[in-house]
Amino acid sequence: MTTKRKAYVRTMAPNWWQQLGFYRFYMLREGTSVPTVWFSILLIYGVFALKSGPAGWEGFVGFLQNPLVLLINIITLLAAVLHTKTWFELAPKAANIIVKDEKMGPEPVIKALWVVTIVATAIILAVALL
């Protein structure tokens, strides 16, 4: 069946996401995937450098000491922290935890996730550096 009426197509500007703060933050959060790809490629490069022996590893360490690579890695770290923060804030919304017939607020869950993250990071750093 066809109609003679012209369908209404709402115009969408290319900068639609810049209108509201929520959308800008959403795009920033989704943009954290780009530094994550960088870090994944960097890890793969490190594994292959480690596989190729001491000379390859020295080259990889030299690459990591490049100021541009250091800057990109700092940006990647900040993006990972932002992504982690937003996921930890979403976690309590996904699970209803009831204690003594009352729904638990999100704060204890978020704090527990951060504590686990900090403890795991401390253990990994201790094992790696000692």
From Swiss-Prot:
Transmembrane regions listed in the UniProt entry: 37-57, 60-80, 109-129
Keyword terms of this UniProt record: Cell inner membrane, Cell membrane, Membrane, Transmembrane, Transmembrane helix
Q: Which InterPro entries match?
A: Fumarate_red_C, SQR/QFR_C/D
One Pfam entry for this protein is: Fumarate_red_C
> Could you say which residues form the signal peptide?
none
Q: Which GO terms describe its cellular component?
A: fumarate reductase complex; plasma membrane
Location in the cell: Cell inner membrane
Q: Membrane topology type, per the record?
A: Multi-pass membrane protein
Q: State the family named in the UniProt similarity comment for this chain.
A: Belongs to the FrdC family.
Question: Its quaternary structure?
Answer: Part of an enzyme complex containing four subunits: a flavoprotein (FrdA), an iron-sulfur protein (FrdB), and two hydrophobic anchor proteins (FrdC and FrdD).
Q: What does this protein do?
A: Two distinct, membrane-bound, FAD-containing enzymes are responsible for the catalysis of fumarate and succinate interconversion; fumarate reductase is used in anaerobic growth, and succinate dehydrogenase is used in aerobic growth. Anchors the catalytic components of the fumarate reductase complex to the cell inner membrane, binds quinones.
- Mind telling me what this protein is named? Fumarate reductase subunit C
Q: What's the gene?
A: frdC
